[in-house]
């Protein structure tokens, strides 16, 4: 349980009382020693997320961001998680950023820089608005980065397969933004010269655990380089599992030579060395079942990543003088 009304904690609000927002709220309450729930914000007064928040003693509003601004404790809230939709986040940011609130965006809006904690948690500590990419991005970009820090990656493709039951209306409304934002982050954070992202909502019953496939076309003609790629991936998997315990390799890492007649130039970005090998990584992400059952690893990796980043900036937020809020 977090420390209620502890002056050393940072008060946070969650906008969006759906699957992601509710899971995040539960994580803050149960597991964070430096964050304290200051508000849960929704637009549906009958939503399960708002009902749970009320039962847990968290201040709530069903009037969206306007309702948040009107809450008595709003001035004390330093960090705001946005778990709504890409379109809604743009409107929310326009209202909240001028007030000096730090925004952590869990939608694919990508108004601020991308943060994938295992790769670049320290790069954007002072950014007023950061974007957590997507669940598929949080699961796969660390792997692309693990390869690209050892060998050039001409092309990286990620496929995220999630249980249909775990995808709420916000996720479904953002499918196009999901693929665009994830592909962009595969390049900018993962280090691939060209990136592609695919999401699959699997309707199988019983629901299947989140599965992710990462394919990288890399320049690794030397056996020592290929060995270093394996070690780099294994180290990265362990790093992500440090904050997402259900994150693991589903199969052994596969590195295969690209046949000479394979037209990989149609995928690879122009310029740079020609790829010699395909690196295939198969992942499974089991959820912690804080809100939805354990098949919803996509919720877990997204909210765990956001929590990790928020906790990493908590000391910065508490150290900043209150009158500098608008310039932080």
Swiss-Prot record:
GO MF annotation, one: NAD binding
Protein name (database record): Acetaldehyde dehydrogenase 3
Pfam families: AcetDehyd-dimer
GO BP of this protein: catabolic process
Organism encoding this protein: Nocardia farcinica (strain IFM 10152)
Record-linked InterPro entries: Acetaldehyde_dehydrogenase, Acetylaldehyde_DH_C, NAD(P)-bd_dom_sf, Semialdehyde_DH_NAD-bd
Keywords: Aromatic hydrocarbons catabolism, NAD, Oxidoreductase
Enzyme Commission code(s) on record: 1.2.1.10
Enzymatic reactions: acetaldehyde + NAD(+) + CoA = acetyl-CoA + NADH + H(+)
Active site: 135
Enzyme class: oxidoreductase
Residues that coordinate or bind NAD(+): 17-20, 166-174, 298
UniProt xrefs under HAMAP family: Ac_ald_DH_ac
